[in-house]
Structures are given as C-alpha cells and as structure tokens.
C-alpha cells in the first residue's frame, strides 16, 4: 500500500478519535495528556492544509463545548498556568505551527 495512503488513513482515524476525546482530555489536570493533545494538533497543522483546518475545528469544538468566547483561550490559559518549561515549549510550538501553517500568511524576511 502506498505510504501516503497509509498516512492519510491514519490521520483520518486520529481526527475522529481526537474530536471524540479532545474536550475530556483538555479538562484533565494531567499536563502529560494535554501535552500529547497539543503535540498531535501541531503535527496535524504542519502535515497538510486539511490537518490545519481540522486542528482549528478541534479548538472551535472545545470553545463551543466550554462556552468560551475565543477558540485560542485554552492555549493561552494553559500557557499562563504551565509550571514546566517542557509544557510551555509544547504550547509555544503549537502556536508556531498554527502561524507557519496559515495558508494566507506571507512572511517576508
């Protein structure tokens, strides 16, 4: 089987699972679980435009579930409350992945 097809199938399954457990995983006090969720979202953002859109959908789903005003509130709240440098790094990496994966963004250096 083509490696790209396997990756696509894997990502589809990950997305389905991610949407099912996303809200409960981020409501836990276990930062290891939350760290893994943000690492998965980062990987989705960088992998493809569809993955980027799915990561934003997951944040939007969480926002609606928690009746928040902004979809990135969870990321900023976690960043402010993070106690370890490792977790802060994962959160900042996720923000970076969102920025570099934005289709309309053109950065000139």
Where do the PLM segments sit?
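Elongated alpha-helical scaffolds that mediate protein-protein interactions in large eukaryotic proteins
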Residues: 1-69, 84-89, 100-109
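Amphipathic alpha-helical repeat scaffolds
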Residues: 23, 76-80
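Charged, helical or coil segments that form electrostatic protein-protein
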Residues: 67-77
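Conserved C-terminal subdomain of P-loop nucleotide-binding cores
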Residues: 95-96
């Amino acid at each position: 089987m083509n490696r790209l097809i396997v990756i696509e199938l894997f990502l589809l399954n990950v997305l389905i699972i991610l949407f099912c457990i996303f809200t409960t995983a981020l409501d836990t006090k276990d930062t290891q679980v939350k760290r893994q969720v943000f690492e998965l979202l980062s990987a989705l953002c960088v992998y493809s435009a569809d993955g980027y859109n799915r990561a934003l959908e997951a944040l939007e789903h969480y926002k609606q579930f928690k009746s928040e005003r902004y979809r990135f509130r969870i990321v900023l709240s976690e960043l402010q409350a993070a106690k370890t440098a490792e977790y802060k790094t994962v959160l900042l990496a996720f923000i970076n992945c969102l920025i570099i994966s934005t289709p309309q963004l053109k950065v000139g250096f």
